[in-house]
């Protein structure tokens, strides 16, 4: 590929949303945003936040909520793209997801990109009282969420 056709390499930062005993059980993202990210801010094009209810080692690990975290990061770092890594479609009703995404897009001045998936952590679904359907049903639900989001973002009077 010719140099003129190449896109510049871009870097994203995946937020460590979990806390641990070394962080005094506070989410590590808070410390990194305070001390580390300001010194390297010019080197990252995007920031990504995972959408889970708890960590992978124990349900008692502190884990920050993804939408609130991205909104906080949008306010602290006004020059980077923002995305979930990856939003679980089954955790929220589709119309609410579309509204939350549209709101963050406005507040961030068009720096938000909706990263969404079918969901895979059955333990999180059941712990919060959500149904955890088969993969084929979750993929069909994902398709519906994307359709509903697009309709709500582009139509004056959407219907599904």
Regions found by a protein language model. Give the residues of each.
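N-terminal beta1-alpha1-beta2 module of alpha/beta enzyme domains
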Residues: 1-76
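Internal, glycine-rich beta/alpha segment that forms the wall or movable "lid"
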Residues: 2-7, 93-160
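Hydrophobic faces of well-ordered beta-strands that scaffold small-molecule active sites
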Residues: 11-15, 47-49, 81-84, 112-116
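Active-site beta-loop-alpha junctions enriched in small/polar residues
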Residues: 16-18, 52, 87-89, 117-119
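Short linear capping/connector segments at secondary-structure termini
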Residues: 50-55, 85-88, 129
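Alpha-helix-loop-beta-strand connector modules within alpha/beta enzyme cores
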Residues: 60-84, 141-152
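Residue-level signal for the nucleotide or nucleotide-sugar donor/cofactor binding architecture
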Residues: 61-64, 91-92, 137
